[in-house]
């Protein structure tokens, strides 16, 4: 069986490729990326660009199961177009089973909300793919490491609401995705990759303080305060919009969910946030 990963040059894509190559079964693994020359090892590199649909149709030929990982393009509406085009290219290429990486709490929204592109991709996949699976994921624990480091510098961990989040390690998402791609019985399923525990803002701040032995409190701020802070930090408009959208979803409880899907799909328990934070925050640079 030939398995393809589209968007394979990013952190998640590379992690999934590594997971697939570790699994027994003699699968042929194809990494589809704009830089196929960087693909090494047993995996085959193929050129594919989400902004050039014709390249995708060629890259997907001969693949039995394909995972589409959306790009990080922040231009409003662009990712929606890319997702639809990638799915259409996979159908045209004759891919039998198409999997799509999405986000927890996805719902119908207007651009530039990040959820809009995931929603459109999910709906188009369900309507057109011969067989499909969706893997929604919670916020990365690794992304929270960056927020924690900034919070330590500022002396406060800020958020739009005191909502709980079950952060998930990137490696656990990769293992779950690999489990879908090599396993059977996943057609028509929607899974949620989450961490094992839901932590409130105050609990997250307390965890950071415990690990680093530095005082830290959690504080609720307004959307205006968040927007101003991001702008002053020098983030581009697309970056500000992305963070605002993610924080709004967090405040709405989109990531306040714990499932057993990571263990079900990967065969191993997901890492708690503490394990991810400990190594990063105990480094000499923090």
Features from the language model and the residues they span:
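Flexible coil/turn residues that form the inter-helical turn or adjacent wing/linker of helix-turn-helix
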Residues: 197, 255, 269
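Short linear loop/turn motifs
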Residues: 243-249, 276-280
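Oxidoreductase cofactor-interface core, primarily capturing Rossmann-like NAD(P)-dependent enzymes
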Residues: 2-34, 51-54, 61, 65, ...
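Rossmann-fold cofactor-recognition segment
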Residues: 40-52
